[in-house]
Amino acid sequence: MSQLFKNFIATTNVTGSAVTFKECPAGKTLVFSGITSFNGNASTVTQQIHLLDASEDASNTIEFGVSYNISSGNALFLDEKIVLEEGDKLGFESDQDTQRISGSFVLLDSSSKTRYRHISKIITTEDSFVDLLEAPAGHTIIMKQLILKNKSGTNATGTDNELRLVEDTTNTFVPFARGNLNNNSIANFTNTMVLEPGDKIQSRITEQPYHVSIFFQELPTPSVRGQ
């Protein structure tokens, strides 16, 4: 697996809309190890990370995580292991100008057998289960992180709000998150979870739309002697 370690440094004076800071090039996968954001403005800035999944929607970004504040002359280090595939984009939205952002990342060949992958999507279904991720035939998925954000404008209350793992062979399921999800709040699941071929991660939220990002590894399922 060819690896190239790189960084980027950029500034922006754009306020009120997301600005693309990094796009994954063709034939590559990009994995961030850390991002630093410095506020050069005299006022406190509120920022929001945006992601674009080119395979899902080439024009609309999703909000990744909650917004955060940085006081004047201070920096914030973000250690999220964000993954971008070919054509995917990382952006930032700020309400103040004079913002400086840098990031460290590794570029990998996307043709490798073990692939680092990313899905971001906007879900417009409410009160019904939606497939967020499914392990394809002949492959195993190792899910590293799932973030779901309520962007409906309304608090989603009650135990009908649920994330669950569905096992393909018997169609049995196990909920791993359930309960209220207030407007502009997130559910952040970081426990490693393995999906065998056909297994699914599903969500049901009582309000819509909501934003979902998932980072995972996908690898061929090896044949095991005696199995």
Which residues make up each language-model segment?
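Low-complexity, intrinsically disordered tandem-repeat tracts enriched in small residues
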Residues: 24-26, 76, 83, 130, ...
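Intrinsically disordered, low-complexity repeat tracts enriched in Pro/Ser/Thr
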Residues: 18, 22, 47, 54, ...
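C-terminal interaction-tip segments
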Residues: 1-30, 34, 38-40, 55, ...
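Intrinsically disordered, low-complexity Pro/Gly/Ser/Thr-rich segments with frequent PxxP/GP/PP motifs
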Residues: 55-87, 170-200
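Extracytoplasmic low-complexity repetitive segments enriched in small/polar residues
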Residues: 44, 60, 100, 106, ...
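Short connector loops at helix/strand junctions that flank enzyme active sites
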Residues: 30, 44, 85-87, 141-143, ...
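Short, surface-exposed beta-strand/strand-loop-strand elements in extracellular ectodomains
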Residues: 42-66, 153-177
